[in-house]
Amino acid sequence: FDDIDLDIVHHTGDKDISIGSHSNNGFVSKVIRYKGLAAHAAGAPHLGVNALNAASLGLSALAYQRETFRDDDHVRIHPIITKGGNLVNVVPDEVVIETLVRAANKDAIADAAAKTDRAFKAGAIAVGASCEVTTMPGYLPALSEKADASVLTAAEIAAQTSEKDYQIVQEDTHAYSGGSTDVGDVQHLQPVLTFNTGGKVSGLHSVDFDIVDEELAYVVTAKIFALSAYRLLR
């Protein structure tokens, strides 16, 4: 980014055309690996150490942290079990959980991450298993941004040259999303101008997601990119 002055970014949205952006959470990513001891699940369960039980207790402990998170910090923690055991008749000796820990600011991310580690390790201690937590960097919180005049004008021209009547709105900078984006990292380095276009049905990452207006999703979007660049460079 050393030779770049600013960036223009786009994402699929719910409105026809929206200019500007609201805030988003940042996050860190974690992999939690429980190690127990295999044994016959029916014949000799007392000889094993159940890593799945440790993980279940860890998930429960994490749930009890919920009341400690401030509403203003928009904390979101959503783990999944990616490995729960190998065979149904064997006490699980390895269980793996992956989770993202999201929040609105760096201090809140650090606080929620520490509570997450503590909760999962507590599950291991309870049943005599071991627990290894690996934390990886994610994204910084995204910043709200008012609609830029050049991008707004570009959107107006792109809409006027379309056969359909597309509505243009300016994004509510006081709104908030619990999701995260790598745009947050870039915003902490240099200016970022944002616009969204619709043309889809159903929610993102859902089985029913589909593009139903290709002109808006592709053509109008490309026009806004090109016209914005032209107006900013001229």
Can you describe what each PLM-predicted range is?
Residues F1-H78, K83-V90:
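Histidine/acidic-residue-rich, glycine-tolerant segments that coordinate divalent metal ions
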Residues S56-R234:
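Metal-dependent amide/peptide-bond hydrolase catalytic core
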